[in-house]
Amino acid sequence: MKNLKLLSLIVCILIGGVLASGQLSAQDLKNNPALDAKVKKFLEDHAGQWRDLNISSYDGQVLHDIIIKGSYKSALEIGTSTGHSGIWIAWALSKTGGRLITVDIDAERHKEALQNFKEAGLSEYIDARLADAHELVKQLKGPFDFVFSDADKDWYKNYFIAIDPKLKVGGCYTTHNISDRSMGGYGRGGNGGSGDYYEYVRSLKNYETTLNRSTLISYKKSEK
């Protein structure tokens, strides 16, 4: 009976610690109601208008919530497009005290993204670069704790290999437009290499990988 009471006490202490740490994390988030209202209005005003390689609002919310939950502060986006995903990412980073580096090779998309970031009130949280990600990603020093890859699928694996050493343990690497073969997805070697990438990341023992609709989410558990 004494052992049972002791075990119950330990469990209660552990649960209390988890709850307390969760409350502390929530308190640590930066509160900016005016910015939140501005971003929400921007997203509402532009709902259904995002085209040109942008993600859905659902996927944007997924990225936002991952960053908040992990308290991530150093983010990289490969493939800005016109900025929809970057807005969701930067919005979360505005709450954690972080900053986003985002890169796109297309000058017109880059220009439009800059305007969208400004209108959403998030420019100060974003370092948007017009560059070839094939070269820039290799040059970036990091470290990063969050990555969103949404560029050329046949380069997905190369991007991952280049960033992996720069991703912190506990960090999250997300990739867009990935589907499980069992769900009628791309399969090995299909759709420009995304199938090969999917199989590669799933095989890594130091990553825990799951699929949320079309977003592959990989958490780094250890260096090797």
Positions of predicted regions on the chain:
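A short alpha-helical cap/connector motif
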Residues: 4-5, 20-146, 153-224
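Bacterial N-terminal signal peptides
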Residues: 8-18
